[in-house]
Design a protein with these regions (language model features):
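Acidic catalytic motifs of isoprenoid enzymes
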Residues: 2-20, 24-224
Length: 224
């Protein structure tokens, strides 16, 4: 499972089940929030700095860091499924606290403060973040149970929550609300997610993950 719907590969990820790296908001009125330090280690992240307007770089960094950190909690390291679910549950509660203006536990404060600023400044839909967490938790449970995806509709539903929210969040940052644009973004993000899955089949199989529709595999005599 991955939030790499924008073809993200990283060489140094946030440590699984550990507190995220520290980061502080800008001090001056209207000053841009510095990029979260850990994000700068991801090899494809400079795309945000090179191609995006300067005012959007910090919000994009905050979204990326949240998604990457949650994804790492779900599938990096050697934690048990229960430990991963507990960590994501803790992050979910902290996210809700941040978005509702309540104090956030120290473990997640530096990760979520820039995200909260981005959400407030750009009116980002809260549900897109919880969709990501839902997808990560589902992936943990299915992997732990040795359960794959019954058919293409089942797999596409997973992409709807694991990949599409990132594209929609980026469109919201740019002020795009047109339904046709959102649907086009969904199609692109889902396609990139599927490509990511299928180019990593050998790696995922060794980790108990299988992102091919089981009905089609059975029809073609494919036994993972």
């Amino acid at each position: 499972m991955s939030s790499d719907n924008v073809d993200v590969k990283h060489t140094e990820s946030a440590a699984p089940l550990r507190s995220p790296g520290s980061g502080q908001a800008g001090d001056g009125a209207g000053a841009p929030t510095p990029l979260p330090p850990a994000v700068t280690h991801y090899e494809n992240f400079p795309v945000a700095s090179w191609l995006c307007p300067a005012p959007l770089r910090a919000p994009i960094a905050a979204i990326y860091h949240f998604a990457r950190s949650a994804d790492d909690l779900a599938d990096e390291g050697d934690a048990t499924a229960q430990e991963r679910l507990q960590a994501l549950g803790s992050l979910r509660q902290a996210l809700d606290d941040q978005l509702q203006g309540r104090p956030v536990m120290p473990r997640w404060a530096s990760l979520l403060a820039p995200l909260g600023e981005a959400v407030n400044r750009h009116a980002l839909p809260h549900g897109l973040f919880t969709d990501l967490l839902d997808a990560f938790e589902q992936d943990i449970r299915r992997t732990d149970a040795g359960q794959g995806y019954a058919d293409l509709a089942d797999l596409l539903d997973y992409c709807r929550r694991s990949a599409n929210p990132v594209g929609r969040l980026l469109l919201h940052l740019y002020g795009v609300r047109d339904e046709r644009a959102l649907e086009a973004s969904d199609a692109i993000c889902t396609a990139l997610q599927l490509i990511n899955f299928w180019q990593d089949l050998s790696v995922d199989l060794s980790r108990g993950r299988f992102y091919l529709p089981q009905d089609r595999c059975a029809a073609l005599g494919i036994d993972p």
